[in-house]
Amino acid sequence: MQTTHSNPSSPSLTLGIETSCDETGIALYHSEKGLIAHTLYSQIKLHAEYGGVVPELASRDHIRKITPLIQETLKKGQVSAKDITGIAYTAGPGLMGALLSGASVARSLAFAWQIPAIAIHHMEGHLLAPMLEETQPEFPFVCLLVSGGHTMIIRVDGIGRYKLLGDTLDDAAGEAFDKTAKMLGLGYPGGPEVSKLALHGQTDRYKFPRPMVDRPGLDMSFSGLKTFTLNTWLKAKESGDDSEQTKADICRAFEVAVADTLSIKCKRALEQEGLNRLVVSGGVSANREIRAKLDALMAKRKGSAFYPRLEFCTDNGAMIAYAGSKRLEAGQFSDLNFACQPRWDLESLEPIDPIEVV
């Protein structure tokens, strides 16, 4: 990444491209007007019959969808290609083929249109997604990033100023949701199916463990909870009780255990850092139970919790366009010899001055 540009004095319009996994997201973010258009195509139906994302199919579908979605987004925003001043694209973490699908289009368009492009960390996009809302969190804050591939607690002092406080040692929370759904024979994607069934579950029938809350620190683990869930289900089936109500009760116990664990860890992080603002982002941040637990935590602390709107909890182009816009405004851009990173340390990102961010 290079930083030789000075901050532009005129308004900018950034095209954001997100293709890290199984959603193709395109958006336009204006430096003064904010988000002016976004489109999203989900590959859920494509992967449903396989019970999970097939990387090769995901890459091919991104290639088919990117250009039409860009055209649709430009039409929605009532702008033309010549109005775009920069392009932001997800360069990692994610599926390599999917990342390259978006990055190659982004770099090609930037070269053809003679405008800068910037590689964006997928999880930075999620972290900053609440900045798209009318009420934005002020720096510094603690952020819980919770998704299918990540569960991290981070101190955020500005864009690019990230300190990892806690991480999962094995499964991410979203991955545990998906695997629980598969154990119980629920549909795809699994997380929303578990949450839907949990609404009908009895709260007190099962008591699941809250992993790693009995020891100091902010790291997390969800593989043991997943195994406990499986054993509970197998015992129920052995006793002849494999009813939908039993499934619902197990889903409820599992969901509450995850929510409690995340709440306890966030409370510790806020106390440790002396902060009272909590940002919760990523696909799992849409979960009702998790939001309820964290809202209750912040209400008790007389603090504030911030979330993206539901449509921006999952992968989307808007969060990439926003993050890219802020970095491009700070004079950062990526050179033509781009590289995607299926694994990418969030703490390694270059910071921009928080004073420059509104």
Swiss-Prot record:
It is found in: Cytoplasm. Required for the formation of a threonylcarbamoyl group on adenosine at position 37 (t(6)A37) in tRNAs that read codons beginning with adenine. Is involved in the transfer of the threonylcarbamoyl moiety of threonylcarbamoyl-AMP (TC-AMP) to the N6 group of A37, together with TsaE and TsaB. TsaD likely plays a direct catalytic role in this reaction. CDD domains: ASKHA_NBD_TsaD_bac (cd24133). Belongs to the KAE1 / TsaD family. This is tRNA N6-adenosine threonylcarbamoyltransferase. It is an enzyme of class 2 (transferase). GO terms for molecular function: iron ion binding; N(6)-L-threonylcarbamoyladenine synthase activity.
